[in-house]
């Protein structure tokens, strides 16, 4: 049965704030265990093993755009792909991964997708979120409940 909505978290939890999408997905999955919520880590292509997809998908990830750390960004996929910050994304890179999914996965193309991103402060060790990014993640967590 196809879920009405779902959430995936993306990022590298071993790289500080870059793991904020995974952190949020894990927290939401514990809060809503029966919902379609998954932590994909740094490999967005793993989503193909999770079919059937929900009708609407919220993708959670980190962003480095120069805005205040912890700031929340709501971007369309097209606008995100135009951003120069996508070069250091996950796996093949965000553009490559989305391009591959769009070319090979008809079901993925039919999903309504929304990106919710949190501005990072640091992407390195230690393996914890910085306080400002955690505050932004807490704010987004409350919005998604």
Regions found by a protein language model. Give the residues of each.
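N-terminal catalytic or cofactor-binding beta/alpha core of small enzyme domains
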Residues: 1-122, 127-138, 143-145
């Amino acid at each position: 049965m196809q879920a009405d909505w779902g959430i995936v978290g993306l990022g590298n939890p071993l790289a500080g704030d870059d793991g904020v999408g995974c952190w949020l997905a894990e927290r939401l999955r514990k809060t809503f265990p029966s919902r379609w919520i998954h932590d994909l880590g740094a490999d967005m292509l793993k989503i193909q093993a999770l079919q059937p997809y929900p009708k609407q998908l919220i993708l959670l990830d980190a962003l480095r755009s120069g805005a205040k750390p912890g700031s929340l960004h709501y971007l369309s996929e097209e606008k995100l792909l135009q951003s120069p910050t996508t070069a250091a994304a996950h796996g093949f890179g965000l553009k490559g991964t989305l391009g591959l999914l769009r070319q090979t996965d008809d079901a993925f193309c039919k999903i309504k997708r929304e990106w919710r991103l949190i501005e990072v402060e640091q992407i390195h060790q230690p393996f914890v979120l910085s306080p400002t990014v955690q505050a932004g993640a807490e704010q987004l967590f409350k919005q998604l409940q």
